[in-house]
């Protein structure tokens, strides 16, 4: 979704929200949470508030009038009824045969509500320096996680990674072969953005940064001499990230054409730009997702930018066997998250079984 459209949609949701949700939004904007995250959370709050009114758990005539006391006095049974509603509600997608929302979507909804409740009961301060209320019913609501061993998850993910020689082969394919299949009209569009697209893909594969971190990169954040970029991690922490050397040529090629091709002026701070009718804009997450999906599908299998992050992490662990190093590269505070990569790189286990 283009940044301008995203901000418009956010304003539409903000216009119907209660004052305390607007307080929450402003607080999280300062962290900073990404606009994409805040947009998704606002959507979940509307879903929840609509249900409160439909279930007669509030007498408010509209969402903006739902009082804080309503949230304060909701019971565990009330929230479980909401979860049941999500699980059994008819899907809004008329082409779907599912009766309700997926567990992943339900977990996302509950995560958004947990964040709001934590803010209202722990983080915010009223005039007396106290939170708005103390009872956090969301702490009593459990989420159901997908049951899958790390080995099973690793095997599923492994098929969607560009490991070994495939990392550079993918870049080489986009650089030299992809164009050969295109019509003359499509070639023109491809050539305009070729350097930029290769720079984005190479950066994701060479650094393992999250999509949002790549989107929010500014020119000042990129040091090609040191091959280091500065990013804002989850939670608003600034971090320096090393970038593998194979991306340098692609990044330099993009910088050589960035100003001329995308009509960039001094005020255009974004590193990755798109241009429409002569106006440069920061390239958004949706556009990068589509771009990565398009090239990867033509090369081997359609993947997301997050799979490119997994690719870097797996290759780095394979080369170092250090979960600590991988967790630092990815911006994780714990090595627990990196356990997955030890299961993807399981050649030793397979060799041991073969020798039995």
Swiss-Prot record:
Domain of life: Bacteria
SUPFAM superfamilies cross-referenced by the UniProt entry: DNA breaking-rejoining enzymes
Regulation (activators, inhibitors): FtsK is required for recombination.
Single GO MF annotation: DNA binding
Cellular compartment(s): Cytoplasm
Keywords from the UniProt entry: Cell cycle, Cell division, Chromosome partition, Cytoplasm, DNA integration, DNA recombination, DNA-binding
An example Gene Ontology biological process: cell division
Domain called Core-binding (CB): residue spans: 16-121
Catalytic residues as annotated in Swiss-Prot or TrEMBL: 210, 234, 306, 309, 332, 341 (o-(3'-phospho-dna)-tyrosine intermediate)
Family statement: Belongs to the 'phage' integrase family. XerS subfamily.
Purpose: Site-specific tyrosine recombinase, which acts by catalyzing the cutting and rejoining of the recombining DNA molecules. Essential to convert dimers of the bacterial chromosome into monomers to permit their segregation at cell division.
Protein name (Swiss-Prot/TrEMBL): Tyrosine recombinase XerS
Organism: Streptococcus pyogenes serotype M5 (strain Manfredo)
Gene responsible for this protein: xerS
